[in-house]
Amino acid sequence: MSIQPSTYSPDLAVPADKRVFGGRDLFSLWFSLGIGLMVLQTGALLAPGLGLSGSLLAIFLGTLVGVLLLAAVGVIGSDTGLSSMAALKLSLGSKGASLPALLNLLQLIGWGSFEIIVMRDAASLLGTRAFSEGSLWSNPVLWTLFFGTLATLLAVSGPLTFVRQILRKWGIWLLLAACLWLTWNLFAKADLADLWSRAGDGSMPFAVGFDIAIAMPLSWLPLIADYSRFGKRAKNVFGGTAVGFFIGNFWLMSLGVAYTLAFAPSGEVNALLLALAGAGLGIPLLLILLDESENAFADIHSAAVSSGILLRLKVEHLALAIGVICTLIALLAPLAQYQNFLLLIGSVFAPLFGVVLVDHFILRKRSAQVASAALRWPALLAWLGGVSTYHLLANLYPDVGATLPALVLAGLLQLVLGRAFSYGRETAQA
């Protein structure tokens, strides 16, 4: 029995009449995805070791470099009309793209589960503060099922419905209100001059802080083309993505640092959530909590699109199955090793997209027309070289930082190997 192609089928280029996202749509989407409880908690990771000034510098530089790379990869989706994992076939070959698709599926299931866990913990905390610890509203199982179901339904509906009917019309304004409220509360109640003058305890090198900050935008590299493929123009894709994500991510991660230092210096797991719950009767935290479901939606939807490369099933059906899996994991797994999880993502996907960016913009000059191949060994070897470089630097020279050197080296290897082998042979055959 043949399966009717979905609008979101990964291998089908989006036709011109379906490319409806303008710059404002993409700004709204990426501003929203740059905001979330996990972004706040990532800022909390930096606070003790780097202090306020060091953390803000690491966040600024990491986010700036990260969003430029993210927006550039978004242009690939706009140029080709393909999903993120389908576009990798142009660089790695039809079979070579299966490995990153599988890795992406696994990491997105992890991200989706983490998002549900974070939402559950925050909602349970708000329920405990508003009612009592034993009340139904503080029940973590209830909230896990609620947020898992909500994120799954959003993922099944798809980004076209979500962005244009929900996020752009009212969602972004609620987010702005929450961020402004948290910012006002910080300036009103914290001694920022004292926090600024206080140095970190040195437990985290600046380069590691940069790597953690850049990991947030880079974590979206394997997803962005799933949404930018619906963009009308490449320049709007680049601008809307870069500006939207930079503002949201820098703002919220900085608030995570400041709130941790000002109101939650104990370093306990729920200390930051308690501090946020105390601001504005918990309403800003509630609004950001609702936004977190958008991040989980993106993880589940893109996991379904990635698995569509491996399984010839309808994306909507895959989204339903993956949403159930994420919810089950959230019920059973603790929130631990988050920092290592972020760095591991950077070790695999940052070098990969160094290869992809060089291949698309320099070697193929933004063309989607390439000779078919099952495996493109030069690109695969360049990727392997980048991943090896990342782990070598991270283990032997942690003060140097690993993400950017690995990405740049992988790109340079692709430039050299691609010209010497794949593209050289294709030119010779022509």
Q: Which role fits each region the language model picked out?
A:
Residues 47-49, 75, 99, 121, ...:
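Membrane-water interface regions at transmembrane-helix termini and the short interhelical loops
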Residues 353-430:
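C-terminal membrane-solvent junction of multi-pass transporters and transport-like membrane proteins
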Residues 116, 120-121, 155, 173-199, ...:
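Hydrophobic alpha-helical segments and their helix-loop junctions in multi-pass secondary transporters
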Residues 101, 129-158, 173-183, 205-224, ...:
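Transmembrane alpha-helical segments of multi-pass small-molecule transport proteins
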Residues 142-185, 238-245, 342-354, 404-412:
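Membrane-interface loop-to-helix entry segments
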Residues 23, 27-39, 183-190, 198-259, ...:
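Hydrophobic, membrane-embedded alpha-helices of multi-pass small-molecule transporters
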Residues 59-92, 102-116, 418-427:
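Juxtamembrane transmembrane-helix boundary signature
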Residues 1-56, 204-210, 229-236, 420-430:
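Membrane-interface "cap" regions at the ends of multi-pass membrane proteins
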